């Protein structure tokens, strides 16, 4: 009887310590985890793809006639400068640290000179043909004085007017030089400060 009780208590003890068998089944499908390396935390990939578009620098606007008129009047009074002198007007050049309406500047200069009886201006058509003949691009603004003089000689001009805008874009200065085509000598030069258009 004691043996029976002892063996029954051992069986009972072992049964209470045994763990239930683990359930065998198909492993559950979990969503693959993805790590984004393209966009920073908190920003969607669409936002990152769009990016930030930089602002286009603003082109400064000037009333070109205000500084140019007194310069042209001063130039026309140059000693030994005969009326009707043939003049090649070089494109105004931008040597500032900003953007300028250079085409308007050149147009304004030509308009002022055409109303002045001192010079006979070489036409834009003549200038374009001469550039083609000399192998100079039509977009070339004759950035070097020597190139402007060479073109002036080809066109049989007596003078070349070289004009540029320099210094800081907030307070630029317009410079003019009248050069004698025959020698390349600068016979007149002047400059003046410019102001922003209202």
Curated annotation (Swiss-Prot):
Signal peptide: 1-16
Family of this protein: Belongs to the LpoB family.
Taxonomic placement: Bacteria, Pseudomonadati, Pseudomonadota, Gammaproteobacteria, Enterobacterales
Lipidation (S-diacylglycerol cysteine): 17
Function according to Swiss-Prot or TrEMBL: Regulator of peptidoglycan synthesis that is essential for the function of penicillin-binding protein 1B (PBP1b).
Record gene name: lpoB
GO CC annotation, single: periplasmic side of cell outer membrane
Subcellular location field: Cell outer membrane
UniProt key word Membrane: yes
Polar residues biased stretches: 30-44
Name listed for the protein in its UniProt record: Penicillin-binding protein activator LpoB
Disulfide bonds: none
Record has Lipoprotein as a keyword: yes
InterPro entries: LpoB
Any GO BP annotation: regulation of cell shape
């Amino acid at each position: 009887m004691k043996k029976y009780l002892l063996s029954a208590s051992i069986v009972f003890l072992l049964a209470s310590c045994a763990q239930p068998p683990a359930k065998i089944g198909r492993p559950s499908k979990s969503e693959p985890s993805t790590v984004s390396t393209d966009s920073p935390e908190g920003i969607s990939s669409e936002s990152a793809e769009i990016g930030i578009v930089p602002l286009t620098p603003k082109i400064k606007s000037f009333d070109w006639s205000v500084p140019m008129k007194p310069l042209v009047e001063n130039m026309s009074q140059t000693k030994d400068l005969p009326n009707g002198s043939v003049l090649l007007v070089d494109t105004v050049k931008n040597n500032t640290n900003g953007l300028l309406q250079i085409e308007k500047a050149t147009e304004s200069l030509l308009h002022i000179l055409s109303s002045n009886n001192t010079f006979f201006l070489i036409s834009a058509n003549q200038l374009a043909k001469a550039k083609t003949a000399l192998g100079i691009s039509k977009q070339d603004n004759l950035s070097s004085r020597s190139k402007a003089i060479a073109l002036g000689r080809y066109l049989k001009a007596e003078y070349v007017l070289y004009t540029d805008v320099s210094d800081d874009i907030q307070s630029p200065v317009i410079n003019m030089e009248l050069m004698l085509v025959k020698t390349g000598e600068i016979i007149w030069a002047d400059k003046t400060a410019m102001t922003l258009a209202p």
